[in-house]
Amino acid sequence: MRSDMIKKGFDKAPHRSLLKATGLKDEDFDKPFIAICNSFIEIIPGHKHLNEFGKLVKEAVRAAGMVPFEFNTIGVDDGIAMGHIGMRYSLPSREIIADSVETVVNAHWFDGMICIPNCDKITPGMMMAALRINIPTVFVSGGPMAAGKTSKGEVVDLSSVFEGVGAYQSGKISEEELKDIEDHGCPSCGSCSGMFTANSMNCLCEVLGLALPGNGSILAIDPRREELIKQAAEKLKILIERDIKPRDIVTEEAIDDAFALDMAMGGSTNTVLHTLALAQEAGLDYDMNRIDAVSRRVPHLCKVSPASNWHMEDIDRAGGISAILKEISRKEGVLHLDRITATGQTLRENIAHAEIKDKEVIHSLENPHSEEGGLRILKGNLAKDGAVIKSGATEVKRFEGPCVIFNSQDEALAGIMLGKVKKGDVVVIRYEGPRGGPGMPEMLAPTSAIAGMGLGADVALLTDGRFSGASRGISVGHISPEAAAGGTIALLEQGDIVCIDVEERLLEVRVSDEELDKRKKEWKRPEAKVKTGWLGRYAQMVTSANTGAVLKIPDFD
């Protein structure tokens, strides 16, 4: 066993002595040592319950004849961090999480790992670590929360609260109505109830093969999640016995399948960023062109909040992620069904008995929302390395208008609230990319303000930053190269005409190459917003969004 490095041989007597101080007995040194990588944090509702959850995982690991050791990672609640400097720490926290898991696991020579993530950057951070460490691993997330209901019976979620602010600001609802939405938008523990980033990533974890069926959709408060814990411990033991590791599971074909699910269910645009980062950790050459190819062959079958009033509980009731996978598997060439997963079985075996139980929630291949995926990759002179739009969250397929430029999210939100944006405009928020932000903050506040003011179908928004999974409307993000790297978005001027063509996958500014070259020669990179601390280091090391915004290792040659 890998853990023999710290527990076998006369020279490891000091190590065993220290381990006995934690409560171990001599007989425990013949069992696998399992890292329980938890993320219990009281300020995050999706993680509030994970302390008790972790206890159940440890019990299940002991019952399977292994020895658990629990530790916790950090985490950032994107909703609470929204709209201030906290959002600059969100994406960078992914790297800290990956590094911290790598540090603890490799320093102590664990034989296997169970990861307990739930919310936005915690899940991809742990997934990156799992691929980097490459020991047998199973993920079991904390699960989504249920949707809420106002005193009038209206179904609401966190997206409703953000949009309620814009609605109140524009006089569409009263302060009492906003308070009612606030009080009921997040009714319990669990990841926010729509197809936002956290739930999108936990669903992708399931199809990638790192988590068990049900991981993405079973609610946090559902007793079936405890059964999932027991299965996770049992499956981990099998993975250890068969020496099946994350890099055996997460192949190029598995990532294809993850994006196939993503396109079918209309997941968050952040999945593109995080899955490209996973590919980097797995040593795979996977780019946005391949994502686009998947998008072209997979139909969009689900519209979940913020694209509709359906929520994760409805997806679960309708058959869960396995039902979506089973349906798209009917189309030839969409899924790679014979690859191994964390169950010890193939994807084909995992979904064999799945079926759609509500075709209003999960559409059939014969009745898709669209013939192509719910996410699209756009390119053009405004995004030479690519950009992402959640096409399933807007009915508008082509938009052209003059740009209204803001050089930060704060500037943009203030401008929107002051009425500087009108019907037909293209809002541009730049210098908010991985390097320029720094940290590539999410633009949920501006998109929610636009939607709440009733302009969701009449105003487009472009940014080199990110969008929350709760964002909707004509929102194009991840524009690469970013403004801080001298990308075309940095060269835009007030009133330039921008064209977004979702069907043709184009993002263009109606300015000649000669004029753009002239502007580029005159452009000067703004001074870095942050020069010290973690964000200062991050800004120096981070790569572009089109490569997952991972950190680059300096060349020491």
UniProtKB/Swiss-Prot annotation:
UniProt xrefs under InterPro entries: Dihydro-acid_dehy_C, DihydroxyA_deHydtase, DiOHA_6PGluconate_deHydtase_CS, ILV_EDD_C, ILV_EDD_N, IlvD/EDD_N
Enzyme class: lyase
Keywords: 2Fe-2S, Amino-acid biosynthesis, Branched-chain amino acid biosynthesis, Iron, Iron-sulfur, Lyase, Magnesium, Metal-binding
Binding site for [2Fe-2S] cluster: C119, C192
Cofactor annotation remark: Binds 1 [2Fe-2S] cluster per subunit. This cluster acts as a Lewis acid cofactor.
Pathway: Amino-acid biosynthesis; L-isoleucine biosynthesis; L-isoleucine from 2-oxobutanoate: step 3/4; Amino-acid biosynthesis; L-valine biosynthesis; L-valine from pyruvate: step 3/4
A GO CC term assigned to this protein in UniProt: cytosol
Record PTM N6-carboxylysine, positions in chain: K121
Binding positions for Mg(2+) per the UniProt entry: D78, D120, K121, E442
Enzyme Commission identifier(s): 4.2.1.9
Any one of the GO BP annotations: isoleucine biosynthetic process
Gene Ontology molecular function terms on file: 2 iron, 2 sulfur cluster binding; dihydroxy-acid dehydratase activity; magnesium ion binding
Residue intervals passing through the bilayer: none
Residues annotated as the enzyme's active site: S468 (proton acceptor)
Names of the cofactor(s): [2Fe-2S] cluster; Mg(2+)
Stated role: Functions in the biosynthesis of branched-chain amino acids. Catalyzes the dehydration of (2R,3R)-2,3-dihydroxy-3-methylpentanoate (2,3-dihydroxy-3-methylvalerate) into 2-oxo-3-methylpentanoate (2-oxo-3-methylvalerate) and of (2R)-2,3-dihydroxy-3-methylbutanoate (2,3-dihydroxyisovalerate) into 2-oxo-3-methylbutanoate (2-oxoisovalerate), the penultimate precursor to L-isoleucine and L-valine, respectively.
Protein family: Belongs to the IlvD/Edd family.
Name of the molecule in the record: Dihydroxy-acid dehydratase
Source organism: Bacillus cereus (strain G9842)
Name of the gene this protein is made from: ilvD
